[in-house]
UniProtKB/Swiss-Prot annotation:
Name the UniProt record assigns to this protein: UPF0251 protein Sbal_3699
Taxonomic path: Bacteria, Pseudomonadati, Pseudomonadota, Gammaproteobacteria, Alteromonadales
Classification via InterPro entries: RNA_pol_sigma_r3/r4-like, UPF0251, WH-like_DNA-bd_sf
HAMAP family attached to this UniProt entry: UPF0251
Bridged cysteine pairs (disulfide): none
SUPFAM superfamilies linked to this entry: Sigma3 and sigma4 domains of RNA polymerase sigma factors (SSF88659)
Similarity field: Belongs to the UPF0251 family.
Length: 98
C-alpha cells in the first residue's frame, strides 16, 4: 500500500498560463504541463536561490521530494525551450488542487 500523499504548501502562481514559441499557433504545438508544485520548486530553488532544505521546509515536503520536483521542472522547461514546445503553467485553480 502506498504512503499517503502529503499536502504541499504552495505560495505562488505563474503570471500567465502558457509560454510558447513566437509565431506558431498554440494549437499546432505539443504542450508540456508544469505542475503547481514543480513551478513552486523552480521559483524557490532557482529564482529565490533558497537551499533545498529551506525550500522543502517552506513547501512542507522532504528535501528529496523537493529535489525530485526541481529536477522534473528543469527538464520540462529545457525540453519546451530546446524542442519548440508550449509550456503550460499552473493557474490559481491548479494551485488549490496540489
Amino acid at each position: 500500500m502506498p504512503r499517503p500523499k502529503k499536502c504541499r504548501q504552495l505560495s505562488s502562481c505563474a503570471p500567465c498560463s502558457l509560454f510558447k514559441p513566437n509565431g506558431i499557433p498554440a494549437v499546432e504545438l505539443t504542450h508540456i504541463q508544469l505542475e503547481a508544485d514543480e513551478f513552486e520548486a523552480l521559483e524557490l530553488g532557482d529564482v529565490k536561490r533558497l537551499s533545498q532544505i529551506e525550500a522543502a521546509a517552506l513547501m512542507g515536503i522532504s528535501r528529496q521530494t523537493f529535489g525530485y520536483l526541481l529536477a522534473n521542472a528543469r527538464k520540462k522547461v529545457a525540453t519546451a525551450i530546446t524542442q519548440g514546445q508550449a509550456l503550460r503553467l499552473p493557474t490559481p485553480k491548479d494551485k488549490d488542487l496540489s
